[in-house]
């Protein structure tokens, strides 16, 4: 868990590209302010991690009666998330995108949906990629993925 917290903190706190025209403060020092207790530092890191994290939820074995009918994707943007979510499903063997959702606000879900492309009967290993965007600026803030199998029955 400490490694995960460290990786997340590094991703959130790493130096970003500077916008044109800004210069870094020459007298700035790396790290937390001197005199902070360990408890205060951990509390701040936990707050940053909570703000930057998001939950993903999707049926990892959705079934479709046939290649052009809706299937039970069960995509959910948890009420605890702070971000808009867009979900893309791609086939692992070809990299072909077979589904893209619209933006889901927190506490919204998609119970069933058709794939963007009809697939023949069979089981298809795929990956669902969740893209998290800020609601106000629609800036991409992160991605997460889930392995899945699309099951086309007929």
Which sequence ranges carry the predicted segments?
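Short edge beta-strand/loop segments characteristic of extracellular beta-sandwich folds
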Residues: 70-78
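Transition segment at domain starts
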Residues: 24-66
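Surface-exposed loop/edge segments in extracytoplasmic proteins
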Residues: 94-101
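Hydrophobic membrane-insertion alpha-helices, especially the h-region
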Residues: 1-10
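A glycine-anchored, Pro-Gly-centered beta-turn/N-cap motif
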Residues: 120-124
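A short beta-turn/strand-edge loop motif at beta-sheet boundaries
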Residues: 64, 77-83
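Exposed aromatic-hydrophobic patches
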Residues: 72, 108-117
């Amino acid at each position: 868990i400490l490694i995960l917290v460290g990786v997340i903190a590094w991703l959130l706190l790493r130096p970003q590209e500077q916008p044109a025209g800004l210069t870094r403060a020459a007298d700035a020092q790396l790290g937390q302010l001197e005199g902070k207790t360990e408890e205060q530092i951990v509390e701040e890191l936990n707050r940053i991690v909570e703000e930057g994290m998001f939950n993903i939820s999707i049926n990892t074995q959705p079934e479709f009666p046939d290649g052009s009918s809706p299937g039970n994707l069960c995509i959910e943007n948890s009420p605890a998330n702070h971000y808009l979510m867009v979900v893309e499903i791609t086939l692992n063997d070809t990299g072909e995108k077979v589904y893209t959702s619209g933006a889901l606000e927190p506490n919204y879900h998609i119970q069933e949906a058709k794939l963007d492309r009809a697939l023949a009967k069979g089981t298809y290993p795929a990956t669902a990629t969740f893209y998290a965007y800020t609601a106000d600026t629609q800036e991409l803030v992160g991605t997460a993925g889930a392995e899945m199998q699309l099951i086309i029955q007929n």
